[in-house]
A protein has these predicted regions:
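Solvent-exposed, flexible loop/coil segments flanking beta-strands in beta-rich domains
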Residues: 82-127
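Beta-sandwich interaction modules
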Residues: 119-120, 147-172
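C-terminal capping alpha-helices of c-type cytochrome domains
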Residues: 62-91
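Gly/Gly-Pro-rich "capping" loops immediately C-terminal to redox-active cysteine motifs
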Residues: 22-26, 38-63
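The canonical Cys-X-X-Cys-His
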Residues: 29-40, 73
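Noncatalytic modules at the cell exterior or secretory-pathway interfaces
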Residues: 126-128, 168-182
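Short, surface-exposed beta-strand/strand-loop-strand elements in extracellular ectodomains
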Residues: 138-149
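Exposed low-complexity, polar/acidic, P/S/T/G-rich flexible segments that act as propeptides
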Residues: 182-196
């Protein structure tokens, strides 16, 4: 009886501040849950079947997670719907947008073999993203704006271990890279550079 009350309170709290929720949980939400829920930021919560249904929904997709993780995933869902934005991530963007494997490991959801990387505020323009992999690569990269505008890139690389693609930023804003690849593939480096 106490858990449903706690959830009801969580959904009416103001959006949480960066670092309130562990980074690993934020990455998990943004690589698994947000792929469906980022389009639902209408300012309303659509849990028509009640709190128990939302718990069942989270457990069905995220697995049998610890109660604290489950609570944080519910808070992230509420934040996405209320603020119509990704939850703030307490991550320093490396100088020159050159990410190494150590930094990328913090932004990796091993269960889904997916990464969610904040690129920071990008001015309007054309950019080149270069991904360094541990060998043959097959996956999907998405560039996502703060307003949830998403551009998909299907990536395949035979064996060189490096693949690049170009993307366009229409309006200056915060941007993110979400990348999902096959099991056993590791993102070792990421380099984002202006291409104009």
């Amino acid at each position: 009886m106490r858990l449903p009350f706690l959830l009801l309170v969580l959904f009416w709290l103001p959006p949480a501040q960066a670092a309130d929720i562990p980074l690993a949980t934020v990455v998990r939400f943004n690589t698994l849950c947000a792929t469906c829920h980022e389009g639902e930021c209408s300012g309303r919560l659509s849990f028509d079947l009640g709190i128990q249904a939302s718990e069942n929904h989270i457990r069905r997709h995220a697995g049998d997670v610890d109660q604290n993780v489950w609570r944080d995933l519910a808070r992230l869902l509420a934040h996405t719907k209320q603020a119509c934005a990704f939850y703030p991530m307490a991550v320093d963007i490396p100088k020159g947008q050159q990410w190494n494997q150590e930094r990328l490991t913090e932004l990796h959801n091993a269960t889904e073999n997916a990464w969610f990387i904040p690129l920071g505020h990008l001015p309007a323009g054309r950019y080149r993203a270069t991904l360094g992999m541990n060998g043959q690569t097959e996956g999907i990269a998405q560039i996502i704006s703060a307003g949830f505008d998403i551009t998909d890139f299907t990536l395949q690389c035979a064996d060189r271990g490096q693949i690049a693609f170009f993307f366009l930023v229409d309006r200056s804003s915060l941007h993110y890279l979400r990348f999902k690849s096959g099991k056993g593939q590791t993102l070792r480096s990421l380099d984002i550079q202006a291409a104009d």
